[in-house]
Structures are given as C-alpha cells and as structure tokens.
C-alpha cells in the first residue's frame, strides 16, 4: 500500500501524475489531434488545458464515441475501446454510451476495489474478509456485440464479465 500512503501525503503530486498520464494518452488519439494537441507540453499547464480542451456536451463527443463503437482504434483513447456502458440517462431521455477501456477497468474499477480492500484489511486485520465468498451485486448481465471488437451494455455487466482472477475466485453468485 505504499502508493496509497504516498498519494495521501502528496495529493498534488499524485494528481499531477494522473493528469500528465491522461494528457500523454490524449496525444495519441484522433480527438487530441483534432484539438491540435501534439505533445504533453501543449497542455501541461492549467491555463493551456482550459484553453485547448474545452468543456463539451455529450452530443459533441457522440460522433467520436460512435467511431470507437464501430471498432476504430485511437479515437478517444490510445488503442482499442472494447466496451461501452449505457448511462442512466440523467441529463436527457436519450440513451448515451460511455467508453470503457481495459485501462479504465484495471486502473480504475479493479484497482480502486483492491485499494479499498487493502485499506480495510490494514485497519481491521482480524476481519477474516478472505475466509469465504464475496457477494457481488450488479445490474443487467448481458452484453450486446456492436462490432467485431466492441460490446455494449450495463457497466456492472462489463465489470463482472472481466473480473480479475483474485476477485473471480471468491465471487458469488457465479
């Protein structure tokens, strides 16, 4: 858990590292090229970021998302975007699809869960958390294939379908 401790003690450095990683990824995408972002140096400062990367509505990103959903690589994220999660539609009645990458699953959802479990075990060492099964509740479990390389559905279906082995071994229901 050294990375958690480091982030707690140096939050600005931790956030800057995440920010620069995202900026670097943006330079490898069609969206980044469209915005004229060739190098992380182009938006390494806050004022450059605000100027070059405007706040947009879903409808502005929808054509980019649809390109990725059809299987095009390097659109909004480097490489493949294999999954698209249906939003709950809180801003309008329209169905919205949110890109979910392998990196988002592993570095966000799964890493976050692992970090929470590690913190819990460190604070409650006699909890016997790993003595039995873990109940995992989710929404709809089916995914619909959209193209040869992309699927869409509920975020919980995407997460549960690709659980890491350390989690899958203890999951219930299976």
Report residues per predicted region.
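Nucleotide 5′-phosphate-binding alpha/beta core
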Residues: 1-86, 92-174
